[in-house]
Amino acid sequence: MGPKRRQLTFREKSRIIQEVEENPDLRKGEIARRFNIPPSTLSTILKNKRAILASERKYGVASTCRKTNKLSPYDKLEGLLIAWFQQIRAAGLPVKGIILKEKALRIAEELGMDDFTASNGWLDRFRRRHGVVACSGVTRSRARTSTPRAPAAPAGPAAVPSEGSGGSTPGWRTREEQPPSVAEGYASQDVFSATETSLWYDFLSDQASGLWGGDGTARQATQRLSVLLCANRDGSEKLPPLVAGKSAKPRASQGGLPCDYTANSKGGVTTQALAKYLKALDTRMAAESRRVLLLAGRLAAQSLDTSGLRHVQLAFFPPGTVHPLERGVVQQVKGHYRQAMLLKAMAALEGQDPSGLQLGLVEALHFVAAAWQAVEPADIATCFREAGFGGGLNATITTSFKSEGEEEEEEEEEEEEEEEEEGEGEEEEEEEEEGEEEGGEGEEVGEEEEVEEEGDESDEEEEEEEEEEEESSSEGLEAEDWAQGVVEASGGFGGYSVQEEAQCPTLHFLEGGEDSDSDSDEEEEDEEEDEEDEEDDDDDEDGDEVPVPSFGEAMAYFAMVKRYLTSFPIDDRVQSHILHLEHDLVHVTRKNHAWQAGVRGLGHQS
């Protein structure tokens, strides 16, 4: 078997041509074996010798990456970008890939290229086409030297005790309580949520001193800031961020620091700093005569003594719950922060000012405060709704399904309307009999009135049937919307991962998969059994009918049972059973609604 065909770069082809010219007595087959290429490929290279050497001279260093002369659809943009890149490199300033993308977007805007997105794929191809090895080398070095991350330990109820904290204290809420139910009784502006995230602020100084360490590997940022973000449910109050770092507290300028800052050896928000933060919040709420609820996300691993808090109630999210602010708010803050750093880097590079690449701690704090202020209140409120607070999934369950009292009231109203219609019908029949006794023209008029009344009654019956169909279809749509909301919020039913779904045979059966034929056979058998049951019910006149509850009634009952069960301290095994049951109910409902829709479609066609 001959060597496998592969596409060579212009530099590799040039080396082959050079080898042939330096060894005229060497057989072509031997040279082909030396470079592990087929003899036909060697013949093609020698045939296009002049064009290959010209391309190597044209692309220079990039010839080590380029394999063809194919031009990019953004050739003009890349020409301007590579000229700017070479100018910056000539000044001795390194450029990272993210700055190349930002500069490319600016050039595209100037050229009117609205379809250009500066994707990672384009950046990789740009580096290969133009030999931007310094930037791509960082990525390759990181890929070689990075070690695989250990799997994260599952979140558990254990907490790190703090100094002076003696176990459970008054005012604590257990982690088993669901935050949406805990927030009941609080106004939207009095429900706060806090989470901690990390930012790097030596990104620019890393560029100024070079991207490579002494051992030739890419250096990583070492100055990390831990940022505590806190906002209320409607987004009307965004508390000043609490920032923690390793550097000592900087001297405040004339205007003071834009946010609170604390320093420690690990650069994280410590228990003492968090206790001080909560104490200040409690004092503020006392001055405003307010009692607020504070939901903690990643702070659940810290043990706090909340006995001194009178106006702040602290609650924790259950393990595995996605924090409201982590549904897009934290990502926005990081995006605004990085954008501010990029603008500073671009200004320094275009001005060829290496000192402008240095980012101090005070300036980083200003960037954090500005990024937090740039988040819109509407975005915060949306993230809370997606987490189940006010109009989220829980609100959909409680509002889309009617209670038993409401259903009884509706049934009584329908019965009263039917009685009124029957009374009106009896009066009309008496009038018709009087008209018939008059005879002659009265009989003809009475017959016409009877025809009109029969038409009206048939129209009313059709309207009632249409209303019943609309109610059943709307109930089905509400159930499907609720199920779809569960999927969009958690990535799966009941918060299951792909591995957990694969391990559940019940869910695999409900989803169909490879057993679709057997499912259809079982559906046909179920239909035959249902028909037999209906015949048995008709024959058995004395038998009592058992009413089948609707999906709304079933889910309302299930929600009641779930709330009752989760009000007790239950272990993970029981919680898993509840989630599996919820998962199965949603799947069965979706399958049933799809079957009903198919039956209705067949009925319309017939």
Curated annotation (Swiss-Prot):
GO terms for molecular function: chromatin binding; DNA binding. Poly-ADP-ribosylated by PARP1. InterPro entries: CenpB_C, CenT-Element_Derived, DDE_SF_endonuclease_dom, Dimerisation_CENP-B_sf, Homeodomain-like_sf, HTH_CenpB_DNA-bd_dom, HTH_Psq. This is Major centromere autoantigen B. There is a cross-link at K246 (Glycyl lysine isopeptide (Lys-Gly) (interchain with G-Cter in SUMO2)). Keywords: ADP-ribosylation, Centromere, Chromosome, DNA-binding, Isopeptide bond, Methylation, Nucleus, Phosphoprotein, Ubl conjugation. It comes from Cricetulus griseus (Chinese hamster). Residues 65-136 form the HTH CENPB-type domain. Its main location: nucleus. Residues 138-184, 392-480, 504-549 are annotated as: Disordered. Residues 405-480, 512-545 have a biased composition (Acidic residues). Pfam families: CENP-B_dimeris, CENP-B_N, DDE_1, HTH_Tnp_Tc5. Interacts with centromeric heterochromatin in chromosomes and binds to a specific 17 bp subset of alphoid satellite DNA, called the CENP-B box. May organize arrays of centromere satellite DNA into a higher-order structure which then directs centromere formation and kinetochore assembly in mammalian chromosomes. It is found in: Nucleus; Chromosome, Centromere. GO terms for cellular component: chromosome, centromeric region; nucleus.
